């Protein structure tokens, strides 16, 4: 700073009506002090010293006119200036500070405690501190900006500035804040919470590359007059919180790159955005890598002409509802969803692409996208790599007016409706070009399972049923019915040695055969010899849902009412004898069934014994007789 004039190291080098130039022999620095009526022109007497002056103090002075580029670093200007202090001065007559400190190596600017005896005349501070790479200390509390209309690039590229409190800056008349804080890469604190932005129409790149900002309070911004928000927060890579929910965007026409590369932003509420006037959404949400949710369902896109790279690299988004988008005016969708690596489904069935000429890389590297609906898409002039990298895409429902599938996996696909199989992409595209309506295609090889009921029937009375699946899916087990029989499973062979396992995924086409077992089984010995045995065992198995009973058929056998079997001599059938029969329950009821098996939750089995008493005191010879049994299942 300018030292006290009584400093013994300080020597007056030159002076004028409103200025004094000092040389400090202790540090070899030149300083300039101004006072009184200071004009906006630089006197020729300074010419030989401009390259040496490091400090300027303006105190108790009256400044008048345009100070545009006054302190600017240039060949014929202040080339080594480090600090400027303007205090206790009348600044009412200053009309411009445009580029006042542009590209200066200045480290410190203090403008405070100044007077405005009349209304301020200052209209522009455009680029006032642009490219002040070394600026670290800053105070403009004494600068009345109430009449300023242009603050474009005011702090642009102040790369080392870490903190900026502009809470008292009057912005009520400002029209342009274009790039106002652009490339303030080290800015960690920025207070703009009291900004009156009611007159602002241009916020293009306002906070561009404010890479160190984690918080920014713009919740009170009045954006009702803003038409340009292009790149407003672009590349503010550390920004974690941003409340724009109250933004009035009804006048905005440009939202290109609005939130581009806001990589740390985890939440963003744009659900109330009025986008009815917007014509470009180019790269609007590019590389918003941390956003897991984004509600754009209310966006009015009827005026939008470009959606290029709109959601490019929104890699954490798992869902995205764009079903209400009016895309009838859009001409380019290039890279619109490129690298949306968490999106599993995308429904663009309502998209009107009749005006679109460029779909290049539209879905490129959407690596987990499984389902894609393009019901109304039409062929665009440029479609290179449209589907490249959609390695997980398993379902594509697509308009017949979209003729080419550039980059789609060259593998097995099939028409899900007509079950037409394609072994490569070329076959698929050839087939699709002959379609007359939107068609759904699934990735994979479809398989068929033919189920032969083997004399049985399915619910539809058919004896055969065919299922169609793709590799990896699971077959459905369908059970047929057959009168008087029990279903014993599906087999891969008609010898019923290889039972089919429905718990395994489908891998090949196959034919299955139904195995049937009669609902019941009754086992009765064909013959017995009374010389060797006096009992006949009756065995039964009930597999069905009815009662099984086994008894004597009295109309077809020679058994008396008292259960005696007639045996005849084989040599002379007129010689006969009786063999008494008995079984459990026959004493009280001679007609009682020999064996009864009721149905159960599982297969039931049982047996009964029919006792045959050998006749005595009969004529010698061989005797035979027949027993006929009746089986009832009801």
Regions found by a protein language model. Give the residues of each.
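Extracellular/surface recognition and adhesion modules
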Residues: 32-34, 56, 346, 372, ...
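Acidic, Ser/Thr
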Residues: 74-75, 388, 454, 476-484, ...
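Extracellular/surface-exposed low-complexity segments
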Residues: 1-18, 393-449, 489-491, 516-518
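Serine/threonine-rich, repeat-prone extracellular segments and beta-strand-based repeat modules
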Residues: 422-444, 492-513, 593-598, 614, ...
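Structural signature of tandem-repeat unit edges
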Residues: 29-37, 51-63, 76-95, 104-123, ...
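N-terminal small/polar-rich segments of proteins
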Residues: 517-572, 596-634
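Secondary-structure capping and domain/repeat boundary segments
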Residues: 445-518
């Amino acid at each position: 700073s300018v030292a006290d004039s009584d400093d013994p190291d300080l020597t007056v080098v030159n002076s004028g009506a409103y200025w004094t130039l000092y040389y400090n022999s202790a540090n070899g620095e030149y300083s300039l002090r101004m006072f009184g009526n200071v004009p906006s022109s630089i006197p020729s007497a300074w010419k030989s010293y401009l390259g040496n002056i490091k400090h300027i103090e303006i105190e108790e002075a009256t400044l008048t006119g345009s100070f545009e580029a006054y302190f600017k670093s240039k060949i014929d200007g202040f080339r080594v200036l480090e600090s400027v202090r303007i205090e206790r001065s009348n600044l009412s007559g200053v009309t411009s500070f445009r580029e006042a400190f542009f590209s200066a190596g200045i480290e410190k600017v203090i403008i405070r405690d100044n007077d405005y005896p009349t209304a301020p005349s200052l209209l522009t501070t455009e680029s006032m501190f642009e490219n002040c790479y070394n600026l670290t200390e800053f105070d403009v509390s004494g600068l009345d900006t109430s009449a300023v209309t242009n603050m474009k690039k005011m702090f642009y590229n102040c790369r080392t500035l870490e903190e900026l409190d502009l809470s008292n800056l009057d912005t009520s008349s400002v029209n342009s804040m274009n790039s106002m804080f652009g490339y303030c890469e080290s800015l960690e604190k920025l207070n703009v919470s009291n900004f009156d932005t009611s007159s602002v129409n241009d916020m293009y790149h306002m906070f561009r590359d404010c890479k160190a900002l984690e918080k920014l309070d713009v919740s009170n911004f009045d954006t009702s007059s803003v038409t340009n928000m292009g790149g407003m927060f672009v590349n503010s890579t550390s920004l974690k919180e941003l409340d724009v929910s109250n933004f009035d965007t009804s006048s905005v026409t440009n939202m290109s790159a609005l939130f581009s590369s806001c990589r740390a932003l985890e939440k963003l509420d744009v659900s109330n955005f009025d986008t009815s006037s917007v014509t470009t959404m180019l790269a609007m949400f590019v590389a918003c890598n941390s956003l897991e949710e984004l509600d754009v369902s209310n966006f009015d896109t009827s005026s939008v002409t470009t959606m290029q790279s709109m959601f490019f690299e929104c890699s954490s988004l798992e869902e995205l509802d764009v079903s209400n988008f009016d895309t009838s005016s859009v001409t380019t969708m290039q890279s619109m969803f490129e690298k949306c690596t968490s999106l599993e489904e995308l429904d663009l069935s309502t998209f009107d692409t009749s005006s679109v000429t460029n779909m290049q890389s539209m879905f490129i590297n959407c690596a987990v996208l499984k389902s894609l609906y393009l019901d109304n898409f039409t062929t665009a002039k440029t479609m290179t790599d449209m589907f490249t990298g959609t390695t997980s895409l398993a379902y594509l429902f697509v308009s017949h007016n979209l003729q080419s599938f550039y980059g789609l996996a060259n593998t097995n696909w099939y028409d899900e409706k007509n079950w037409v199989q394609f072994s490569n992409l070329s076959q698929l595209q050839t087939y699709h070009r002959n379609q007359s309506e939107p068609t759904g295609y699934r990735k994979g090889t479809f398989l068929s399972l033919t189920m032969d009921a083997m004399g049985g029937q399915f619910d539809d009375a058919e004896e055969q049923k065919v299922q169609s699946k793709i590799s990896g899916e699971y077959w459905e087990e369908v059970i047929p019915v057959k009168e008087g029989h029990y279903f014993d499973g599906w087999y891969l062979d008609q010898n019923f040695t290889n039972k089919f396992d429905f718990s395994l995924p489908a891998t090949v086409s196959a034919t299955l055969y139904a195995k049937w077992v009669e609902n019941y089984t009754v086992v009765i010995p064909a013959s017995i010899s009374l010389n060797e045995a006096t009992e006949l065992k009756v065995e039964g198995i009930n597999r069905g849902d009815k009662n099984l009973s086994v008894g004597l058929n009295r109309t077809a056998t020679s058994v008396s009412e008292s259960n005696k079997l007639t045996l005849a001599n084989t040599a002379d059938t007129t010689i006969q004898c009786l063999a008494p029969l008995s079984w459990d329950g026959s004493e009280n009821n001679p007609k009682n069934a020999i064996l009864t098996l009721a149905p159960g939750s599982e297969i039931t089995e049982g047996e009964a014994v029919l006792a045959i008493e050998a006749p005595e005191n009969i004529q010698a010879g061989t005797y035979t007789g027949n027993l006929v049994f009746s089986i009832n299942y009801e």
